[in-house]
Amino acid sequence: MRPDRFWLKSDEIGEEFTVVGNFLRNASEFLALRRNTSLLLVALLLAGTGEKLWLGFAPKYIETIGGSVFIIGLFDALQTLLGAVYAYPGGWLTDRWGQRRALLAFSAVAVAGYLLVLAWPHWLALLLGSFLFLAWSALSLPTTFTVVATSLERHRHTMGIGIQSLVRRVPMMLGPLVGGWLLTRFGWTDGVKYALALCIIMSLLTAAFQWFISEPPDKTLETDLNENVPVFSISFSGVVKSFTPALRELLVSDILIRFCERIPYAFVILWAIDHGGLTAQQFGYLVAFEMVTAMLCYIPVAHLADKYGRRPFVLATFVFFTLFPVTLLWARDFAWLALAFVVRGLKEFGEPARKALIIGEAAPELRARTYGAYYLIRDCTVATGSFLGAWLWSISPQANFIGAAICGGLGTIWFWWFIYRKR
């Protein structure tokens, strides 16, 4: 038998490599993948998986080790508040230090927080440690937006953020599944310890990939567009004054929508386990349903939003935010809770488009600080929603869900009236 029936000839091998190379180039172009964005995606995957191994179970863990409903609400409020407070300094440090150095510093601070919670199994350790371990997700948010903005063309921003959002959801799906198995297998106390140990290892791997992120050519920009005012002398109020009218209206509607999300956020796991009779592992399945739903939306919606406009998709995502607490009212078993979490996944339908709107409205020389200021104002305001949620939950779970839905409806109407109609 002829040998060439088993092996390709050299010219045929070259053609095969050409076809594969063209496919990979086309795929990377469609998905808006560049060196920095690709390295960032790996970092987000590793850091996010480590965090989600245990953080989503923290409210039940606090309850297990003796924390009250108020402590659960306080911990949830700290997540929101620190996410807000850290956003602006995260943007400032990114503008000042550059993307790589800032990300490495944020990872180091987060690891210190994980070590504290691992060494001291007490609800107070979670409250104190949150000031440290939330550094990655909170401080790095403006940095991740800046990486997209500096690496991609303007008309590719939604796809860049969409891919980033897609990758962020992989840990949100895998983390609770693995974490739920650890908690079911080893119990709440030991299970959280094992999850934290894995989290620390993955955070160290994250830093290794961040080391290779390169700085964009305009990193050393020191003055604003009129070349008279040093960029770093611009105050927080000056950054806020630079907000366009569209960005301000988006901020108001976003605040109302985040109240809708925050009010029931910490208590959904209590509803599922205490009222729905689910195990920790079954709750992990619910989160997986949510993440799969969100992931299926990101790429096609990002492509359509870049092509046809972002505002209709933002309006749709606000509607799904509002529907989630409504569906929880009837969700008292696994099947109905699964449906509710699919609706929760659909709330990510237009999130990349919303973030791309922020990118589009931000001045390039103030980009990271604009993101930080936006999230500082939004999340500082919304942090009170955790206490409101705890108070409503103490009345009844139904009061909590209805209050959330009212906020969502108001936010959706605001966006439609002030932004969507004016496109």
Put a short name on every predicted segment:
Residues W7-R34, P216-S253:
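Juxtamembrane intracellular "pre-TM" segments in multi-pass secondary transporters
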Residues N22-L82, A246-L286:
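Helix-loop boundary and gating motifs at the non-cytosolic
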Residues K60, T64, L174-K193, L270, ...:
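Transmembrane alpha-helix termini and helix-breaking/packing motifs in multi-pass membrane transporters
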Residues V85-P121, A305-R311:
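Conserved MFS/SLC helix-loop-helix module at the cytosolic interface between two early adjacent transmembrane helices
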Residues A108-H122, V319-R332:
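C-terminal ends and interior cores of transmembrane alpha-helices
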Residues F131-R168, L357:
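Cytoplasmic helix-loop-helix junction between adjacent transmembrane helices
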